[in-house]
Every structure is written in C-alpha cells, then in structure tokens.
Amino acid sequence: MVYTFYDASIVAAQQALGSLSHLVDVAEQQPNASELLTARLYEDMRPFSSQVHLAAQTIERLLCRLDNREHVPIEDTLATYEDLRQRIQSARKELDGTDKETINKRGDESAPTWLMPGMTVDMTGAAFASGASMPNLFFHLSMAYAILRAQGVPLGKWDYIQDFMKPQLPSAA
C-alpha cells in the first residue's frame, strides 16, 4: 500500500476528529461536565470548547486551501456538548466529501497561502498541510486532552490514539 498525501492529511484529520469526538463523549459523562466546557490549562489559553472549535476550523482551512476557496471563519460560539458534536460533524462531513485523487493532485500545487494576518506565502498544499494544518490540528486535539486530564477526567493514552489505530486493529477490537 502506498501512503499518499490524502492519507497524511484527510485520513489523519478524520482520525483526529474521531479522537476528539471520543474526548467530548467522555467529558460529557463526568459529574462536572458543564464546567469542563470552559476549563482551561491556564488563564490566557483557550477553553476546552474552543479547542474543539479550533480543531474543526483548522480542517476547514486546509480544505479551503486545497480547493482554492477563501476560508470564512465561523465564530466560536460553542456552549454545549451538542454544539461540540455538531461542529465535529460539520468538519467530518467536509472531509468525507473530498476526492482522494483530487486531494493528492492538489498537494503538489503551489498557491499563495494565508498563514496569519500579514503573512501569505507561496507554498504547496502538502507543505501547508504538513507545516501548518496538521501540527495545529494535533495541537488542539492534545490541548483538549490535556485540559480534561488537568480537570481529573479519567483518560489514558488509548483514549487519544484509538481512532488513529483502528485501521491496524482486527475488526473485533
């Protein structure tokens, strides 16, 4: 099997959303579930709900870049667990609508790419994915996990990686 740009970006993003969805489910089952939505690692950091929003937005920004569309940010208004699930589902739906052949081709195409206010750089889709999108996605997934752990939510490494490992496991696992 050949590992492609599609696998490294789209499939990995789908797996990250699966992991994030699992974290949301576990958080909602906790006695302090309502407090977890606004929990932060540190006062100047974004809360758990925003980590979910930013992970989904990172995926949407990548897909816009690969589709040569302008990304229009969605306001961060997630206030309930249902809001979090809908945001994850929206990003999942966009990922599921991608075409493997098209994504693989777009990974090699170079275009002006917005990185932050005042910084647009000409780069390939693959360079944007590997240098910005995927690290940001994994950062926000990791922060969501860390926030929950800091609040005493009983999570282990398996809770984080299980969706990444599913393709390698026997179907009974």
What are these regions (language model features)?
Residues 1-10, 22-28, 166-173:
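Basic/polar N-terminal segments that are highly enriched at the extreme N-terminus
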Residues 2-16, 35-57, 75-84, 120-136, ...:
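Alpha-helical scaffold segments that form or flank carboxylate-/histidine-based iron centers
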Residues 13-16, 20-23, 27, 55, ...:
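Amphipathic alpha-helices that form helix-helix packing interfaces
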Residues 21, 25-28, 56, 60-63, ...:
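Hydrophobic/aromatic-lined pockets within catalytic cores
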Residues 31-38, 97-129, 161:
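Acidic interhelical loop/turn segments
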Residues 44-72, 91-101:
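Conserved alpha-helical segments that form or flank metal/cofactor-binding pockets of metalloenzymes
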Residues 68-82, 148-156:
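Long amphipathic alpha-helical coiled-coil segments
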Residues 126-171:
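C-terminal or internal capping secondary-structure element at the end of a domain, subdomain, or sheet
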